[in-house]
Amino acid sequence: MVHVRAKDAVGQYGERVAVRRLTEAGMTVLDRNWRCRSGEIDVVARDGDCLVVCEVKTRRSVSAGTALEAVTPQKLARLRRLTGEWLAAHPGVNPPRVRLDVVAVTVPERGPATVQHVAGVS
């Protein structure tokens, strides 16, 4: 039997919600949870001719700050480096534009999750 920590389950749920939001917005998901030695990219998608690298942050409440506040300048710098590594690992992908997005998901104890998609955060 595989045991999933509650925090991990919330994060996985948030990523599923985020992917649904991105696809409903017309994007095509190219990769999920891509990992390399330097870290992980939550979602890589295509929005027209633009490659979108998306950080997903999920919170149960805003008591420790919002999900968007958790995306620091250091996190964005790391995401930019990871984007370069993803592109190097996928030589057939040569987008004319690359954009970093954040999808913030808040999962309350009751009721539906709230989702905020911020395009072009860096």
Curated annotation (Swiss-Prot):
NCBIfam families in the record: PRK12497.1-3, PRK12497.3-3
Name of the protein this chain belongs to: UPF0102 protein Krad_1407
Lineage, opening ranks: Bacteria, Bacillati, Actinomycetota, Actinomycetes, Kineosporiales
Molecular function as annotated in GO: nucleic acid binding
Signal sequence segment: none
Family in the record: Belongs to the UPF0102 family.
Organism: Kineococcus radiotolerans (strain ATCC BAA-149 / DSM 14245 / SRS30216)
InterPro entries according to UniProt: Restrct_endonuc-II-like (IPR011335), tRNA_endonuc-like_dom_sf (IPR011856), UPF0102_YraN-like (IPR003509)
UniProt xrefs under Pfam families: UPF0102 (PF02021)
